[in-house]
Amino acid sequence: MTNIRKTHPLIKIINHSFIDLPTPSNISSWWNFGSLLGLCLAIQIITGLFLAMHYTADTTTAFSSVAHICRDVNYGWLIRYLHANGASMFFICLFLHVGRGLYYGSYTLMETWNIGVLLLFTVMATAFMGYVLPWGQMSFWGATVITNLLSAIPYIGTTLVEWIWGGFSVDKATLTRFFAFHFILPFIITALVIVHLLFLHETGSNNPTGLNSNADKIPFHPYYTIKDLLGVILLILSTMSLVLFFPDLLSDPDNYTPANPLNTPPHIKPEWYFLFAYAILRSIPNKLGGVLALILSILVLALLPFLHTSKQRSLMFRPITQTLYWMLVANLLVLTWIGGQPVEHPFIIIGQLASISYFSIILILMPISGIIENKLLKWSL
């Protein structure tokens, strides 16, 4: 009798995706973040669903409904902080996942990579809208500042902003639609994740060497299921430590003050995971230029397959580009720091220099170093 997992129409799909999937035998722990992102998404959807049962998307009651969840709902504080800190863990895993793709040349799998970039944009949009929902000071002013950026678009900018707001300022209509979008987007993300995996399993995974691994593949289960399980345990451990010991470590104290349109906070800034992009936005004095730089800071990832000049896929044996890669990582940390600082000297100039070097490393220096390494290895023929 044939095994049911190989014959049943539905179980067969799961079998080919997570059990009998041929996987390179040498993929490291950097390949764990895909499954961890899946776990983060599941946690966010489940906790979000429970929060939505008690939350009210109305400007008069939104803030107090969040307080009610924390005070009166059974384990409401746990659900709320799991959701808030789960977003931070989600972005940590996302950045590490993208960083691994950049280091090991996974962007050469074009379809998978492009869906991944689209996923990154969608997750960022979802997180931004979620930050508006508690209707604290930073929620309100963050929503005002970021949506107002669209007014930089020529001709239709102002109309577009008022259309998104549903009025002449961020108000009840804005909050209601943001809640609706924040609720629906995770399910769209889930659909995109399935497409992401579909494209990945079409070509097979990359590996640290960047070489073809078809000659040496092992089944995903039990080897990588047990390896993923270790990652899952570590993620849950670190998330629960954050939630139970330092729940407000990554949030803004201003968001514990109810939204007040008449009182602007001293420093308007987004959540920590958007600070690098916010720093790039602020580094350009022109409004439209800033918006374009902001979009390009993420969209530049989609250009990576076209900027790949090396004959080698991975950075494993490319010391010059490795150095540039770690310079880029350091640069992003500097941008994250600058994004949280006030707009004054010396932070302005540091932000501008870091923004220039961010785009220079990706668009100019890395492709040049690829060509140099080819020459050094006499592979340019």
Swiss-Prot record:
The chain crosses the membrane at residues 33-53, 77-98, 113-133, 178-198, 226-246, 288-308, 320-340, 347-367. One of its GO terms (biological process) is mitochondrial electron transport, ubiquinol to cytochrome c. InterPro entries: Cyt_b/b6_C, Cyt_b/b6_C_sf, Cyt_b/b6_N, Cytb/b6-like_sf, Cytochrome_b, Cytochrome_b_C_euk/bac, Cytochrome_b_N_euk/bac, Di-haem_cyt_TM. Heme b b566 binds at H97, H196. Keywords: Electron transport, Heme, Iron, Membrane, Metal-binding, Mitochondrion, Mitochondrion inner membrane, Respiratory chain, Transmembrane, Transmembrane helix, Transport, Ubiquinone. It is a multi-pass membrane protein. It comes from the Eukaryota. The keyword Membrane applies. Component of the ubiquinol-cytochrome c reductase complex (complex III or cytochrome b-c1 complex) that is part of the mitochondrial respiratory chain. The b-c1 complex mediates electron transfer from ubiquinol to cytochrome c. Contributes to the generation of a proton gradient across the mitochondrial membrane that is then used for ATP synthesis. This is Cytochrome b. It comes from Rhynchomys isarogensis.
